Amino acid sequence: MTNFFIPPASVIGRGAVKEVGTRLKQIGAKKALIVTDAFLHSTGLSEEVAKNIREAGLDVAIFPKAQPDPADTQVHEGVDVFKQENCDALVSIGGGSSHDTAKAIGLVAANGGRINDYQGVNSVEKPVVPVVAITTTAGTGSETTSLAVITDSARKVKMPVIDEKITPTVAIVDPELMVKKPAGLTIATGMDALSHAIEAYVAKGATPVTDAFAIQAMKLINEYLPKAVANGEDIEAREAMAYAQYMAGVAFNNGGLGLVHSISHQVGGVYKLQHGICNSVNMPHVCAFNLIAKTERFAHIAELLGENVSGLSTAAAAERAIVALERYNKNFGIPSGYAEMGVKEEDIELLAKNAFEDVCTQSNPRVATVQDIAQIIKNAL
């Protein structure tokens, strides 16, 4: 039996952000708390969204304190503001950091306690505060998922919180919000989306439904990510990547992830590194480890990513997937290893132990020991 989770409503395309006030009104909201980061707030985007909400006859407050790799401290501060402002809905603006922060605020505001109490799978008892997630980057897919990743500031460990109840009520994906994003951010978020599609396609929980989303996401990313990097104002490329990251998010939300994310959660949490780049660095090494478990699928991935596999055996074609990922990293100027990013060999044991315990490890296609994971991280240095 397959369970499939997706936001009850999704609005995708140019100008979609103008739907926010109408959508909030439809779900019965009276006052929304906008959750965003300081930079997006400084651009005036949150005020534009707030204006749209007010024009729909609703009240609004703004919490512009979402941060990369959001921590429990920001979540709890947001919960306090949500309650002080007497809000009954949340609007997140940004990428995964804003969306995950809003999901976590909505969870704790409705269920009590601390976000740290909800680490793991299906630990949420009551319905959460509705979230309208407005995406400004093509990468995390967080607007589609039942996952929030929050850093435990005391333990310096990323805590995945997974529960269908935290899936946003409405996902808004507007490519016009993605134009003019710098190439570096486009690369990091685009490679994050690619990692979602690849891991979902080979995950233990993959189904024909998730396969369809993952395959189409890989096709679009292979064609349009280089174009979006080369010209951030290419609206066709931005729109294609908007759809790709949405589909990749749906795929991994229902099919699962794997060691790419288990490892990057730890590396990013300890060293405060960009999530998409952490994924990119370890992805060739994780895929090399997983090849024997999903050889035919990796052969297909190689083809989807532009490798010529004609005349090759399935095993040889599968290895071309690793070549493709290394090509992506080289072409996009991604560091060749974690050492360049400041990761220290003496931390590998702790990183591997925490990655082994990460919930994403459960859906990796090949069973891995702590020692296996340590070797993968060492290879990625």
UniProtKB/Swiss-Prot annotation:
Select a single GO molecular function from the record's annotations and give it.
magnesium ion binding
Question: Where is it found, in Gene Ontology cellular component terms?
Answer: cytoplasm
Q: Does the keyword Magnesium apply?
A: yes
The UniProt note on how this protein's activity is regulated states: Stimulated by the activator protein Act which requires the presence of magnesium ions. Inhibited by 1,10-phenanthroline.
**What are the EC numbers?**
1.1.1.244
Annotated keywords: Cytoplasm, Magnesium, Methanol utilization, NAD, Oxidoreductase, Zinc
What cofactor does its activity depend on? Mg(2+); Zn(2+)
One Pfam family assigned to this protein is Fe-ADH
- Mutating residue 103 to R leads to what result? Loss of dehydrogenase activity. It does not bind NADH
Give the top-level enzyme category: oxidoreductase
Phenotype for residue 97 to G: Shows an increase of the dehydrogenase activity and a decrease of the affinity for NAD and NADH. Completely insensitive to the stimulating effect of the activator protein Act. It does not bind NAD
Reactions this protein catalyses: methanol + NAD(+) = formaldehyde + NADH + H(+)
The record's subcellular locations are:
Cytoplasm
Name the protein family.
Belongs to the iron-containing alcohol dehydrogenase family.
The record's function comment reads: Catalyzes the oxidation of methanol to yield formaldehyde. It possesses a NADH-dependent formaldehyde reductase activity and cannot use NADP.
Q: How does it assemble?
A: Homodecamer.
* Name of this chain's protein: NAD-dependent methanol dehydrogenase
Q: Which organism is it from?
A: Bacillus methanolicus
